[in-house]
Amino acid sequence: GLGDVYKRQLLFRFVSSLAVSMSTVLSIVYHLEVVQLDAFQLVLVGTVQETACFLFEIPTGVVSDLYSRRRSVLIGMFLYGLGFLMEGALPWFAPVLLAQVVWGCGDTFITGALEAWIASEEKDKPIDKVFLRGSQMGQIGGVLGVVLGTLLGNINLQMPVILGGSLCLLLGLVMVRIMPETNFSPACLLYTSDA
């Protein structure tokens, strides 16, 4: 049977996808109407976020491979939450720009680390089924996040960004308590033991 790690990764995939899609579904509208960015600033915000993701990909991968996949995922979730809270609570150009770096960095901490954590913790399980179910839960959470974000955004455009960020932080706190890491070996040990 499939165990606790399987259920926890389903929870993580569902809630994280819900929170991120809730925070981002109306981001262009939020940036235009609330933050009142002009066309150049909009392009700059997108470029900074993409650049942050690119630049942090290698250093954050090192954390995952050498120190802890669990730690990498948790750091990423807290950075997502902090970035979205900053973006939603401080609707001015400079904080919104900084928020893109923060949550873009958070994204790179999670990318790859989550899959590696699942694969190492569930190594005796049918991993294709584990990943498929995780992906399905992420898609369901993402769709629900779009619906909730749109409904909340009709009330107040800051609300879905702030609530999504808060949900990321709450998920991070829950995962600190329930996310095990029992099968991790630093990558440097794996490389040297093969020699």
Predicted regions: what they are:
Residues G1-Q9, Y191-A195:
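Conserved small/polar residues in nucleotide/adenosyl-binding loops
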Residues D4-T51:
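Helix-loop boundary and gating motifs at the non-cytosolic
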Residues E50-F54, I58, G142-V143:
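Residue-level signature of mid-helix packing/kink "hotspots" within the transmembrane helices
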Residues F78-P91:
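C-terminal ends and interior cores of transmembrane alpha-helices
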Residues W103-G138:
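Cytoplasmic helix-loop-helix junction between adjacent transmembrane helices
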Residues L144-V161:
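Transmembrane alpha-helix termini and helix-breaking/packing motifs in multi-pass membrane transporters
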Residues M175-C188:
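Helix-loop junctions on the cytosolic side of multi-pass membrane transporters
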